[in-house]
From Swiss-Prot:
Name by which UniProt lists this protein: Serine/threonine-protein kinase ATG1t
Enzyme Commission code: 2.7.11.-
GO biological process, any: regulation of autophagy
Binding positions for ATP per the UniProt entry: 13-21, 36
């Protein structure tokens, strides 16, 4: 039986080429913990850097949705980390046991994952391996607490910088990672979108036997592969979030700063405002969330972000149109009840004051119906003016998005 200071290893949980994980117990209190023992001789320079990043980050944070580091010990041959023990297993085992979950549970889980990820990204860390297996559950019943764990692939990533190493788990890897392109923290957000989709469906959105097959399935999809039955039961805001997290264009992928679950929760089928959120357990920082009628109000005060916002919301509408075409769900229902059409209205009202917007508007080759939509949501014409969404084509929206992207 392995011993370390105040902890005794009881039973082996797992073993890899570089480490062994034990279930441990504190000798005095009897409190259970997890002991990870690393063989330093088997760690290359890159793995040592990742381990150092993990230790540096975990030793500096104390947040209920991030696994807690209790103790570290090192000699010439081994390094041992003692982490808190979560008796609820992993989110993966939870999904295997219970299958898909209801939206209110998924949103509650997403709020906790988002809270932990906000701290991670605020510390300029990219996790790179977010998946249900690396999210631990503590507690039982209605008091489940989710904790992001396993930072073995995490790296420091300062603003404006990118990574290029391909790593992670294929079902949850962003397409830019799978394509050997450079990536930033938005890759973590794609992983969160895949987890949200799996919570709602019981399986990941894109699967395959290897990275190539997963990427091929992503690129060949004209819409997110929602189950038609489940899609009919989903709140439009939930469809909105899935579409914006799982955008194949990283520039259009929802960022943690706009992650809606940090500012609103679902009660029955109504989004309810949650005006404050304490990002750290001991209240070292507080995130204020402005709301309009209980809904998240996006910050439109910074002109520099205007093209980016337009791009994100137009790409959502594009994804929605494609989804409607495949599933047969009326496009007008998805768009008119979705959050993005309301945000797009705010954005266009602000954009119409900009010279570049008018130049772009004149350059677009729009059909009459689409022009009516643009003028309506932009506040140029009366909302009583009739129009239909059916004539908005994907190609037109792609062209619009490309124009806006050039201003980002």
């Amino acid at each position: 039986m392995m011993m370390l200071d105040d902890y005794i290893a009881k039973s082996k949980l797992s073993e890899s080429l570089t480490s062994t994980v034990w279930l441990a117990k504190h000798k005095l209190t009897g409190e259970e913990a997890v002991m990870k023992c690393f063989d330093l001789s088997k760690l290359n320079r890159n793995l040592r850097d990742c381990l150092n990043n993990e230790l540096e980050f975990l030793s500096s944070v104390d947040h209920p949705n991030i696994i807690r580091l209790l103790h570290v010990s090192q000699d010439d041959d081994f390094l041992v980390m003692v982490l808190e023990y979560c008796d609820g297993g992993t989110l993966s085992s939870y999904i295997q046991r219970y299958g898909r979950v209801e939206e209110d549970i998924a949103k509650r889980f997403m709020k906790q994952i988002g809270a932990g990820l906000e701290i991670i990204h605020d510390n300029h860390i990219i996790h790179r391996d977010l998946k249900p297996e690396n999210i631990l559950i503590d507690g039982s019943g209605d008091d489940l607490v989710l904790k992001i764990a396993d930072f073995s692939l995490a790296r420091k990533l300062h603003p404006g910088k990118y990574l290029e190493t391909v790593c992670g788990s294929p079902f949850y890897m962003a397409p830019e990672v799978l394509q050997f392109q450079r990536y930033n923290e938005k890759a973590d957000m794609w992983s969160v979108g895949a987890i949200l989709f799996e919570l709602l469906h019981g399986y990941p959105p894109f699967r395959g036997n290897n990275n190539v097959q997963v990427l091929r399935n992503i690129k060949s999809s004209t819409a997110l592969p929602f189950s038609r039955l489940i899609l009919q039961q989903m709140h439009p805001d939930c469809i909105d979030v899935c579409s914006r997290l799982l955008s194949i264009n990283p520039a259009a992928t929802l960022g943690i700063e706009d992650f809606p679950f940090l500012g609103r929760i679902k009660n029955s089928r109504v989004w309810v405002k949650d005006t404050t959120f304490s990002s750290r357990q001991h209240g070292t920082r507080e995130r204020k969330v402005a709301t309009i009628n209980g809904r998240l109000q996006f910050d439109l005060s910074q002109d520099a972000y205007l093209p980016q916002r337009l791009l994100e919301n137009l790409m959502y509408i594009y994804n929605t149109i494609e989804m409607a075409r495949v599933t047969g769900v009326p496009t007008s229902y998805l768009i008119s009840r979705g959050e993005s059409i309301k945000v797009l209205s705010q954005l266009l009202r602000k954009a119409k004051q900009k010279t570049w917007f008018f130049q772009m508007l004149r350059s677009w080759n729009l059909n009459k119906e689409l022009m009516k939509v643009q003028l309506y949501v932009g506040g140029f014409i009366s909302p009583t003016y009739s129009f239909t969404y059916s004539s908005i084509t994907s190609n037109i929206l792609i062209n619009i998005s490309n124009d806006i992207y050039s201003h980002c």
